[in-house]
C-alpha cells in the first residue's frame, strides 16, 4: 500500500491487502477498496461526505477523480470495472463489468449498468442511465463534447 491515505471527519480509508495504490494516489475519508484493485498514479478518491466503494478487480487509471455529493449521494464502482485515464466519477453508480473511457465524466445520480460502456470524452448527465449494449453513443445518457 502506498499513496496518501488520510482520515477525514472520523472516517479512514479501508484497503484490501491485495490492492495496489500508486505512490501519489490520494484516498481520503470514507473510501473502501476491494481485493485486487489498482488505483493508479495521480488518482484521487475523496470520501468527504457519503462514502466511496470500489469493488474487487477494478482499476482506476491515472488521473481519475472520484467524489461524492454533499446531499447524500455516494460514489460506487462495482467489481471488474475499468476506468480510463482522467475520468471523473461524481456521486454516481458504476455497476459490475462496466467500462468508462478516458476523460469521460459521469455526474450525480447517474448509473452505468453492468456491462455497459461510456466512450472516451463522453459526459453522462445527472440522473441518466447508460444501459448495457446501448453505450454512451445512443444519445439518451451522454452528450458528446463539441469539437472544432
Describe each region flagged by the PLM.
Residues 26-33, 44:
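Short, contiguous, helix-prone interaction/anchoring segments in small proteins
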Amino acid at each position: 500500500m502506498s499513496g496518501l491515505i488520510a482520515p477525514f471527519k472520523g472516517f479512514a480509508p479501508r484497503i484490501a491487502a491485495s490492492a495496489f495504490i500508486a505512490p501519489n494516489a490520494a484516498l481520503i475519508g470514507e473510501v473502501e477498496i476491494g481485493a485486487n484493485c489498482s488505483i493508479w498514479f495521480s488518482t484521487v478518491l475523496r470520501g468527504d461526505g457519503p462514502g466511496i466503494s470500489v469493488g474487487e478487480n477494478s482499476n482506476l487509471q491515472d488521473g481519475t477523480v472520484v467524489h461524492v455529493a454533499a446531499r447524500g449521494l455516494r460514489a460506487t464502482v462495482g467489481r471488474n470495472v475499468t476506468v480510463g485515464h482522467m475520468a471523473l466519477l461524481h456521486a454516481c453508480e458504476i455497476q459490475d463489468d462496466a467500462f468508462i473511457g478516458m476523460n469521460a465524466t459521469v455526474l450525480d445520480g447517474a448509473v452505468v449498468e453492468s456491462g455497459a460502456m461510456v466512450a472516451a470524452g463522453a459526459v453522462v448527465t445527472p440522473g441518466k442511465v447508460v444501459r448495457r449494449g446501448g453505450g454512451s453513443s445512443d444519445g439518451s445518457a451522454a452528450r458528446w463534447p463539441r469539437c472544432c
